[in-house]
Structures are given as structure tokens and as C-alpha cells.
Amino acid sequence: MSEKTDLSELRRGTELVKRGFARMQKGGVIMDVVDAEQARIAEDAGAVAVMALESVPADIRKRGGVARMPDPDIVPEIIDEVSIPAMGKSRIGHTKEAEILESLGVDMIDESEVLTPADDRYHIDKRHFTAPFVCGARNLQEALRRIDEGAAMIRTKGEAGTGDVNQAVHHQRNIKSSIRELVGKSYEERERWARDHEAPAELVHETAEMGRLPVVNFAAGGIATPADAALMMHHGCDGIFVGSGVFGAENPRAMGRAIVEAVNNWDDPDELAQIASNPGKGMKGEANADLSEGEKLQTRGV
């Protein structure tokens, strides 16, 4: 006699379900929001999901201090305001912030380097949560470590809050280049690569056989214009996270719509030219080259 299937387990919490939810966001734009009003603007602009946080990354940079999870009073307001999925950011290694966000009902948790890390050595063990996680990565080995911990989605770290897409491009190219390298290696060479890069061997082999990451891979960090979003899609990303680029712009509604349209038409230069002329002035931005090592967020959590 076959074992009885637990339908509640199938609906939520399994690795298959968590990765499936992440795949449902593919081809879309996820926007950072700090309150219900911004969440409404994001949904009206065509976002596939919103990400709740205390402040957008550009404001976190300006303000300094300790950046934490969003106010627990604000999260339910954001969830109730929109019909699209609502996500929330937690600090790296802060298991309790993640548990609170899950209890509040968020659809996904971003263990984010944008917030002040709670643990300099360890990330959250994401396998035991029912909510899926997204994590940032600068290269393939970081991405595979996060997937091994239970991440259902990877995103480039980029350099959040700068409006400079340079590092997001760099990180995406790093990941794709390493995957191409692995595809051409023998079993023994992949095992050696896994040891040398402190990456889980099983995932190294799986990635090489698939020719891509085992989970969806979004772009994030410094995306500030429709052209930036289209560029990251050109480089093979599955979708886009954007925060300061929308609500730091002169006209957030128009910029949000334009970025969504750019993702939908990333391979049509004529359409992109029309889209890029509509949203008005973007955020001011700060060049990555001007940042000191201490000002870089991407180095948090390896």
C-alpha cells in the first residue's frame, strides 16, 4: 500500500515547491518598496513582486548606521495592499529576522548584504524554512554555496544603491564564465574545481550538466534605467531586482513602467529607444570606482 501524500507539504515548503515559486517570477521585475503606497505603485507599474525593506539601498548608504529587517507593522500592510507576491529582506545570518518574516506571511525572503550582517561567518540554514530564499552572489562558488544552504533563487550582488550597473554586469559575467569552464571539464577536473573553490561538488556537477545554475538567476545591484535592465537580460539573467532606481527617480511610476517594458522588450532596440525616452530623469547615482572598500556592500557574506 502506498504512503499517504501530505498535500500541505506539497503546497509549501519542499525544495521543489520553493524553486517552483522562484521560477514563476522568471522574466519579471521585482521592486523594492518601503510602504504600502510604494507597493501599489510597483504593482501598477507591472512588477511581478515587491520586496519590503526598511529603506531603499541608496538611503541606507546615506543614512549609515545599522540596517535591519522591515518594520513588522509595515509588512502586513504591504501584503494586504497588493495582489502580487510580497517578499522581505533579512540580515545575513539572522535566523530570527527570517522566522519573523515567514510568520508575517511573506512569499520569499532575501538574505541580503544590503542590510547589516548579523553573522560574519555563517548564512542562515534556509533548508528548514517553508518560505523560499533568494541570496546574492558575485561568482559561481558563492552561488553554489547559497544553493547548498537552501536558496531557491540567486541574484547578482552588484553594488546596491549606487545606480551603477558595472558590478552587476561583472558578477553575471563571472558566473556565466565559470559555468562555461565547468561544462568543458572532466569529472575529475570538476571535483578539483569544487575543492579549490570550496563549492559543493554535487552542485558543481549538476551545474555543468545543465549548463546553467540549478535555480533561477536574477540581476540586482545598481540597475537604474530601462537600458540597464535590458543589458542584464542580454547577459542571460532570468529577471531583474530594482530598488533605488525606481523610487530614487524623478518619476517613480514612469520609471517603474519603463523598466518593466524594457525587460519585456530587451532584444528589440527600436522598442527600447521608445521606452528609454519616456520615464524622465533617473537617480543621481554614484560610480563604483569612487567607493572605498569599506563602502562596498558586495563583500558581505561569501
Swiss-Prot record:
One of its GO terms (biological process) is pyridoxine biosynthetic process. It comes from the Archaea. Pathway: Cofactor biosynthesis; pyridoxal 5'-phosphate biosynthesis. D-glyceraldehyde 3-phosphate binds at residue 173. Residues 293-302 have a biased composition (Basic and acidic residues). Catalyzes the formation of pyridoxal 5'-phosphate from ribose 5-phosphate (RBP), glyceraldehyde 3-phosphate (G3P) and ammonia. The ammonia is provided by the PdxT subunit. Can also use ribulose 5-phosphate and dihydroxyacetone phosphate as substrates, resulting from enzyme-catalyzed isomerization of RBP and G3P, respectively. This is Pyridoxal 5'-phosphate synthase subunit PdxS. The gene is pdxS.
